[in-house]
């Protein structure tokens, strides 16, 4: 079976390209990693998968470890000064080294000075393998990637970091190129015209990809691959999406609940005394995958239906499938504890979201949607937006960040307000402590103060959508329009120029694809997708509604296209505002993530 998504592609690359490539029957090895490589591995492989491949122990290179001189070690490391020094130190020992021999795999290109240092050390005598596997990104979901570089927004957009910008662009470009190479893609590269940084990053990615292509001329070959594209877009193209209260399950939960490192914590009651449970929300949970993009209004209904079907399939009758009922079902069917716990978790999560929604969020959603759309539920243009926002700004019960979200949406709708008006709005809302955060939207290309009254907006033109929506979920992320135009080959070439000429599309492709279908095998024997991919990189963080759009557009093409989206990091609205807050600060004044 072909890998179904990014996590599987990366997992296969680590298992085949690293661990199995040095595996010998009946021989155990130690796996040593640093923090970045551990994050990559844990995002796509289970510990049991690793141990099943003849690995006896997995260790952190930066922690004190017991020497095991009888075993060989596999090192999977990022090529940094700290990790290379720790690696050299493992083979400095007398009378014995920490391990018998070293198989070294760097996640990316090792800088020349570090390489020289390695070759001059005692380690050089016992190195059996030394490879660069070019895997400098995290597969966050099947169609979502992260470069795990949340600080890059600050480096790219803060005026005090202009000197860092070129270096940051080079680093991001290298990471994006490793993503394309891992997927066997050599896409045509396009960028949103306007901001300098999008063109700079697009050109830098092309240079890095050309270097990969020189090493591996077959990169990007195969039926239909010539249609693959990489789009570089900046957060300023759509500052609205990360500000809205989204009502689809994943985005809503991450916005309203305290979910850290994808872990949802909640109190369980019923079976005995209350206790805290921690549940990882990831793609190993098929129920989460089924529910995460659903509107909250449909989630509880769906879980209840699925639970009922499950109980009926096990010949158990239930009256009301609610949480209290679940503990009663569990007593009757203890053997299905794992499955029932899953239903219980998602009922809890949905319930938790609804409690917050009914509390204060519901009244904000209508205002936010009207401001984002510029029209009300009837499609009538908003004539007096000030009337909409004043009750929210004056309401002491609304938290500061929620007021700021509404304020920024108002400013974006008006395409800037006068200095005097801005001061009044900030005072009404009582968010004086955050006035620089609001002004920092300008660093992303938004207009905050506009002395001559409302100016002309540089927003991208929107598609008209006629499909029915929930009244509080009328907004569609701009990026979804862009994805649809790209896969239909309707993206405006003036607004989205190519940095390299697109490959000519010829009728011969159809014949080839009929021969190969959408999959072909690469050298390692792993099936790779042969249909075209649209890869989108958003500078400044990607919102969860935009992640959802990638799946929706893929589905709408019946799998002819696969849309991937990613960024330096994943945004929640709070995270987006926290990022904005730093954009006028000096490095020594902030704690970067």
From Swiss-Prot:
CC terms in the record's Gene Ontology section: azurophil granule; cytosol; plasma membrane; presynapse; secretory granule; specific granule; tertiary granule
Matching Pfam families: Sec1 (PF00995)
GO molecular function, one term: syntaxin-3 binding
Gene3D superfamilies attached to this UniProt entry: 1.25.40.60, 3.40.50.1910, 3.40.50.2060, Syntaxin Binding Protein 1, Chain A, domain 2 (3.90.830.10)
GO biological process: intracellular protein transport; neutrophil degranulation; presynaptic dense core vesicle exocytosis; vesicle docking involved in exocytosis
UniProt keyword annotations, A-Z: Protein transport, Transport
Disulfide pattern: none
Protein family (similarity comment): Belongs to the STXBP/unc-18/SEC1 family.
Subunit structure: Binds syntaxins 1A, 2, 3 but not 4.
Function comment: Involved in the protein trafficking from the Golgi apparatus to the plasma membrane.
Protein name: Syntaxin-binding protein 2
Source organism per UniProt: Canis lupus familiaris (Dog)
């Amino acid at each position: 079976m072909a890998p179904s998504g990014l996590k599987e592609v990366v997992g296969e690359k680590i298992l085949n390209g690293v661990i199995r490539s040095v595996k010998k029957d009946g021989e155990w090895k130690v796996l040593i990693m640093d923090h970045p490589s551990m994050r990559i591995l844990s995002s796509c492989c289970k510990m049991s998968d690793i141990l099943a491949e003849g690995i006896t122990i997995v260790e952190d290179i930066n922690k004190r470890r017991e020497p095991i001189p009888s075993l060989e070690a596999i090192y999977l490391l990022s090529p940094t000064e700290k990790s290379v020094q720790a690696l050299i130190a493992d083979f400095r020992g007398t009378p014995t080294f920490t391990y018998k021999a070293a198989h070294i795999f760097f996640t990316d290109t090792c800088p020349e000075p570090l390489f020289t240092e390695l070759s001059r050390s005692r380690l050089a005598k016992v190195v059996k393998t030394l490879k660069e596997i070019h895997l400098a990104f995290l597969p966050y979901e099947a169609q979502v990637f992260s470069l795990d570089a949340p600080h890059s927004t600050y480096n790219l957009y803060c005026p005090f970091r202009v000197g860092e910008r070129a270096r940051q662009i080079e680093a991001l470009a290298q990471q994006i190129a490793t993503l394309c190479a891992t997927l066997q893609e050599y896409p045509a590269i396009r960028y949103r015209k306007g901001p300098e940084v999008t063109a700079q990053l697009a050109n830098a990615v092309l240079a890095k990809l050309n270097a990969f292509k020189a090493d591996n001329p077959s990169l990007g070959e195969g039926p239909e691959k010539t249609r693959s594209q990489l789009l570089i877009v900046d957060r300023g193209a759509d500052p609205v999406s990360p500000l809205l209260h989204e009502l689809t399950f994943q985005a809503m939960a991450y916005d309203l609940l305290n979910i850290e490192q994808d872990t949802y914590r909640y109190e369980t009651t019923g079976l005995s005394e209350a206790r805290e449970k921690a549940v990882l929300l990831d793609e190993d949970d098929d129920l989460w995958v089924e529910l995460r993009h659903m509107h909250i209004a449909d989630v509880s209904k769906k879980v209840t239906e699925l639970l009922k079907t499950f109980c009926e399939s096990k010949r158990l009758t239930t009256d009301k499938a609610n949480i209290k009922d679940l503990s009663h079902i569990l007593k009757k069917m203890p053997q299905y504890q794992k499955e029932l716990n899953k239903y219980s978790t998602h009922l809890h999560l949905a319930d938790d979201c609804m409690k917050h929604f009914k509390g204060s969020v519901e009244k904000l959603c209508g205002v936010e949607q009207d401001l984002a759309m510029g029209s009300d539920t009837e499609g009538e243009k908003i004539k007096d937006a000030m009337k909409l926002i004043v009750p929210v700004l004056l309401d002491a019960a609304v938290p500061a960040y929620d007021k700021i979200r509404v304020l920024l949406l108002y400013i974006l709708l008006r395409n800037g307000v006068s200095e005097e008006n801005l001061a009044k709005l900030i005072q009404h809302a009582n968010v004086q402590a955050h006035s620089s955060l609001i002004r920092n939207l300008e660093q992303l290309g938004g207009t905050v103060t506009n002395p001559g009254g409302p100016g002309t907006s540089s927003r991208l033109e929107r598609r008209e959508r006629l499909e029915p929506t929930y009244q509080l979920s009328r907004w569609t992320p701009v990026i979804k329009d862009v994805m649809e135009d790209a896969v239909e080959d309707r993206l405006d070439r003036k607004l989205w120029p190519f940095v390299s000429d697109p490959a000519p599309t010829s009728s011969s492709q159809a014949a080839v694809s009929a021969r190969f279908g959408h999959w072909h095998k690469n050298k390692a024997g792993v099936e790779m997708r042969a249909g075209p991919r649209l890869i989108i990189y958003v500078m400044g963080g990607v919102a969860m509604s935009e992640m959802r759009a990638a799946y929706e557009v893929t589905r709408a093409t019946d799998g002819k296209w696969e849309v991937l989206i990613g960024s330096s990091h994943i945004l929640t609205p709070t995270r987006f505002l926290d990022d904005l807050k730093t954009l006028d600060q000096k490095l020594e004044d902030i704690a970067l993530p």
